[in-house]
A protein has these predicted regions:
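Residues on the lipid-exposed face of transmembrane beta-strands in outer-membrane beta-barrel proteins
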Residues: 35-37, 57-63, 89-95, 111, ...
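Short loop/turn motifs that connect adjacent beta-strands in outer-membrane beta-barrel proteins
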Residues: 22-30, 66, 96-106, 121-122, ...
Length: 272
């Protein structure tokens, strides 16, 4: 019943979004509807579905004034992982300081509620606050952008099984620090009516402050580094397709005992 309600919310948001998209006035609602397939789902170093593929539907809304909201689901394509299905409810505010200047800062402040619909909210649900700071012009190489992300995660309820009294001896409460470097390389467009597209090179390294989202006993250490490449193909009619390949170097066995991970993804997106 709980799962059905959540799916209904996503479908309703998608229907409303597409309804607005029929006549997208300058002041109307804007955003995107997206479905992503992943050959495996790795989240902040953790292999969530034990090397199984996953599907991620989402609806993203631009509410204006820098405010945005989204709903994203995560579900394994194999049976046996129903308890690991997760829905993320995300509200955020984005803006910029000194745009166009060398010391420009693009920032986002966000709140996420992580809900596991097949489990009680008192067992596994999580909440998160994060701040994202990007510096688009600080480096002399055009398109090379460093980003820092500060994450604070905590159990939705104080008596949660993933809280400070987790049977596994760990906690889902604490901080993570993520350092990213992205490089966009413009190339001749390969999509419909697109004269140019961008090859995106992504890298990140994560310092985990001892946070296990499932209450696992996780070390306070540099946990993992990720390297990836992706690009977006313009299919016309506001549709696009984004394939990507990623590789994780695991530095902390308490986060991922399977050593390194490699996976692919493909996203189909409609913007309105």
């Amino acid at each position: 019943m709980k799962k059905g309600t959540l799916v209904s919310v996503v479908l309703l948001l998608a229907a409303v979004s597409l309804g607005y998209a029929q006549e997208p006035g300058p002041g109307g609602l804007h955003g995107s509807v997206d479905v992503t397939y992943l050959s495996k789902y790795v989240w902040r170093g953790f292999d969530i579905y034990n090397d199984k593929s996953a599907i991620q539907p989402s609806v993203n809304l631009d509410l204006g004034g820098g405010v945005g909201a989204s709903v994203m689901g995560h579900r394994a394509n194999s049976s046996g992982y129903e308890d690991g299905e997760r829905w993320d409810y995300y509200l955020h505010y984005s803006n910029a300081i000194n745009p166009g200047e060398k010391n420009a800062v693009n920032y986002r402040i966000g709140y996420v509620y992580y809900n596991y619909p097949d489990m009680s909210s008192s067992i596994a649900d999580l909440q998160e606050l994060h701040a994202i700071l990007s510096f688009p012009n600080i480096l002399p190489v055009k398109g090379l952008v460093p980003t820092y992300v500060l994450v604070k995660l905590w159990p939705s309820e104080s008596g949660s099984m993933v809280g400070c009294k987790s049977p596994a001896g760990g906690t889902a409460s604490g901080f993570a620090h993520i350092f990213m470097l992205d490089y966009g390389i413009p190339v001749q467009g390969m999509g419909t009516g697109s004269p140019e597209q961008v090859i995106n090179l992504h890298s990140e390294v994560v310092f985990n402050d001892g946070v296990g989202p499932n209450g696992a006993n996780v070390d306070q250490d540099w946990s993992n580094a990720v390297f990836g490449i992706s690009t977006t193909f313009d299919l016309g009619g506001n549709f696009s397709l984004t394939p990507g390949v990623y590789h994780q170097v695991t530095m902390d066995k308490s986060v991922n005992p399977d050593n390194d991970e490699t996976w692919a993804s493909v996203s189909a997106t409609y913007k309105f």
